[in-house]
Curated annotation (Swiss-Prot):
Pfam families: Virul_fac_BrkB (PF03631)
Alphabetical keyword list: Cell inner membrane, Cell membrane, Membrane, Transmembrane, Transmembrane helix
NCBIfam families referenced in this protein's UniProt entry, alphabetically: yihY_not_rbn
InterPro entries: UPF0761_bac (IPR023679), Virul_fac_BrkB (IPR017039), WH-like_DNA-bd_sf (IPR036388)
Family named by the database record: Belongs to the UPF0761 family.
Protein source organism: Azoarcus sp. (strain BH72)
Family matches, as HAMAP family: UPF0761 (MF_00672)
Residues passing through the membrane, by range: 29-49, 92-112, 131-151, 172-192, 197-217, 220-240, 241-261
Domain of life where this protein originates: Bacteria
Compartment(s): Cell inner membrane
Membrane topology: Multi-pass membrane protein
Gene Ontology CC annotations of this record: plasma membrane
Presence of the UniProt keyword Manganese in the record: no
Name of the protein this chain belongs to: UPF0761 membrane protein azo3165
Amino acid sequence: MHLHPTRDFLRLLGERFSATRCPQVAGSLAFTTLLALVPLLTVAIGVFGNLPGMDKLGASLKDFLLENLLPDRAGRIITTYALQFSQKAARLTLIGTAMLAVTALMLLATIERVFNQIWGVRHRRPLLMRITVSWFMLTLGPVILGGSVVATGYLVSTSAEWSDRLPWIGEIAAATLPPLLLGALFSFLYYAVPNHPVRLLHALAGGLCAALVFLLMQRGLGLFIAGFPTYTLIYGTFAALPIFLLWLYLSWTVILLGALITATLPAFLERQRMLPAFPGDRAWAAVEMLAALAEAQYDGRPVGFAALRRRTNLAEHAAEALLESLRECGIASRTEGGDWVLTRAASDIRLSAVLQRFALDLTAWSALSPGRGGRIVAERLREGLQAADLSLAELAAANTSAGAVQVG
């Protein structure tokens, strides 16, 4: 019995892993990362070089990447060449430097787009906000990560002072601090990058899972390369490139897996409270969302995404998709703050139009019917909808008690 939740979660995770085409997306991100590697290093070196007292942070960050992230021999070869290219790139003109920065920003924009797809978000941040967030991550991200590495190294060295009396303290610190630091880095990505509210606890769970799988992947890749040195025997030094590409691909697969865990946790934990499937369930949810927006319109306020979800008990991705459909219909729109409002007066929105959009497309019914009988049925259904029709304002008035909303 205790295995059922784990089995259900893994099944749901596998379905979303396949639906989001993670293997193909990881390959695309690996290639994009390879192109943006030198620009990223150039910006990072520029940040560490221009800020006073940052040399130690840069050296600590480089050592951490080599020891905990990059594959051993291939990572050192690639890092050596990339640093040489970055030092040469630092002598570029203003236009060349700008192009490098644009290339690095394009990678971050691609990561944001992929994360939004995983969370089912179709509405991206405004362009200026995206550029600001990406530039912040590009410039201050290495500094924060370098500072974290230095702090981690200090904790490890401090724990080593106790290793003479308690040897296990140093071993535990050396074994746990790198995964925790990686987990914090991944958790920050899952929490900050998607244009969607993410609970910190879910981001931490996804980040720690990704960090553990990442370290296991790194160890496994190292053992594979050491046990099957075919690439090294055939290609020599050039073997670093395919090994590095493989490492990039596996790394992005793990990062995307952690993002999927973070995005899947809310739907899995709330599965008992989700709306049960029934014929017309999407139309019912659309009407309930529009009724909530109509009630809020009378009060002159928007409605948040979480409140609309609670009203309908929809899963996050289903609620996001339904709201996007309402936006595409021109009925609702998202504010700059991320909340939702009606685009016109509630008295001008008829429920018959909503039902025909989300449950019963009578125009398609009539057009696809091969005989006159099908068209007669469509016309009778249309007449029935019109006879029982009411506006959103009338529905909101019924929900909030008589006379609470003015009916137009």
